């Protein structure tokens, strides 16, 4: 029996339509991607709210001069980075900064108190530039994503930001605008979702 051309045409048309439908993303897929992207951006913004706060930024200077206070004024006594990020021999950071806050003098303290390496200078950078420097192994101490998460969520010096002690006048130092637990979650989620830096 000879098959009429019209039937062949209809059969091919139906098959083509089915193939197209099978390979067309569903609306729900778009919604899921958009939701995931928005969630990642929220985590990024929350993380950056902390990294650009004085508690972090004061120890990530671009001029090798540690900063102090909410106004980020230069460290008293003419302190500077020194060759190993710990000041100079006669004025080493741990001369005053011990492993914990001094509630009598108001001098802050945490384990291995020091300036961040010069390669991690964030002062004056945009959020995007900070993120790029954070992820670049040439500037982040050759840390992998896993090591960065550990550093940012477990290192006592980083977490000091939420237990900064008091000023010499007895006033409490300002805390970052995000809670410690929310910051940790934001960091973990951002890296888990690929550490994507928003384009704007």
Model features per residue range: what roles?
Residues 19, 24, 68-69, 74-77, ...:
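Generic alpha-helical propensity signal that fires on short helical segments
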Residues 34-37, 71-74, 165:
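A generic structural signal for ordered alpha-helices
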Residues 42-52, 72-92, 120, 176:
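Flexible gly/pro/ser-rich segments immediately N-terminal to CXXCH heme-c attachment motifs
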Residues 54, 91, 101, 106-200:
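C-type cytochrome heme-c attachment and multiheme electron-transfer modules
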Residues 64-84, 99-108:
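Inter-heme linker and motif-flanking segments adjacent to c-type heme-binding CXXCH motifs
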